[in-house]
Amino acid sequence: MTSQGVLSAGPPQASTAPSGGSAVHEVTSVGARVALVMAGGTGGHIFPGLAVAEALRDRGWRVHWLGGKGTALHPSMESQLVPPRGFAFESIDFSGVRGKGPVTLAFLPLRLLKAFWQSIQVVRRVKPDVVLGLGGYISFPAGMMSVLLGKSLVLHEQNSVAGLVNKVLVGVADRVFTAFPGVLKNAEWIGNPLRPAFTRQPGPEARFAGRTGPLRLLVVGGSLGAKALNDLVPKALALIPANARPIVTHQSGARQLEALRANYQAAGVQAELTPFIEDTAQAFADADLVICRAGASTVTEIAAVGAAALFVPFPSAVDDHQTTNAKFLVDQGGGCLIQQRDLTPEKLAHLLQKTERSALVNYGLEAKKMQKIDATARMVAACEEIAR
């Protein structure tokens, strides 16, 4: 079975640093090598960036993070997640333009000029030995200005279909890595950077040994939640007799928890509801079946754990890249894929009732065969090679 969601850690307080400024500052040794990590927007960009940032710090690097600040009402995810982990947080004013109206596009040249200038200020102040771009629109102005200022640029593309920013930056980057094969010309296929917890879980056969009773179901909608899954899953579970119903943990996304709670109450179904999952690796390992979207990080994490997944790709994903992500595992027997338009409460209820744990073990085993677990180490090695 197959999915999307990228998990998230609970959001600590957002930083209040001004645009072009630095929020949290690390205490590091004088003369340490310096990396500037550019990533933002969603967990799919941020969590791989954190994996690399933490590994670099463990090797004595001083790491700064460049992202967007968001607004007072809706701070960016990176401004919430990065500073509490001890990294200096820099911000510039730039966000996505794809699908925006004509007014936003009309002001794009001015916004770009401002973002270019802010990026120059950040790069000059931080003085990085290496700049790493892990996606998000924020990477475009900062990546271009880094190269203009003579800095080495390392890129990583998480998805099976390259994003617009990386398509542009690949021509000026020193090293390019991808999570899936054949995504960018002359790139090295290494998989997605992972936090160590995902590679330390017992294998599927060991985890499933001795499990009996109702299935343990985990529903994750990614770092931003998934309204369609929040609406559909409670209705499907209500169609299953209570004595045969799975034991459910459902991650809602920060802004959708109350709506999800109302959906389960209306369906008369009990479930553990949470806006975020702090330890996603353990949650994947504990579940018999994960219902999720098919963001690149989620697919990578599913493979690393060897979890069984039902992927429901986000239908509005750019270039339908979530379907392509999911097929990387599903085509090898490492999960199941159902498009959102084809998934009804009745169909999901039927699938859950007929699913056997033995089949889920096989999904997990096949998914695990597709894992690549050295992406973080290879990106760190590239940075150290460049910085010599």
State each model region's role:
Residues 66-80, 85, 203-204, 208-290, ...:
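Donor-nucleotide binding loops and adjacent catalytic segments primarily
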Residues 2-16, 21-70:
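N-terminal subdomain of nucleotide-sugar transferases
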Residues 62, 88, 147-205:
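Active-site-proximal region of nucleotide-activated glycan assembly enzymes
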Residues 129-130, 285-300, 307-308:
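Acidic donor-binding loop of glycosyltransferase active sites
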Residues 359-373:
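A short, well-ordered alpha-helix in the C-terminal region of glycosyltransferases
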Residues 32-40, 57-111, 254-256, 341:
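Conserved nucleotide-sugar phosphate-binding/catalytic loop shared by glycosyltransferases and other
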Residues 373-388:
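C-terminal alpha-helical cap of glycosyltransferases
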Residues 97-130, 148:
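An amphipathic, basic-hydrophobic alpha-helix
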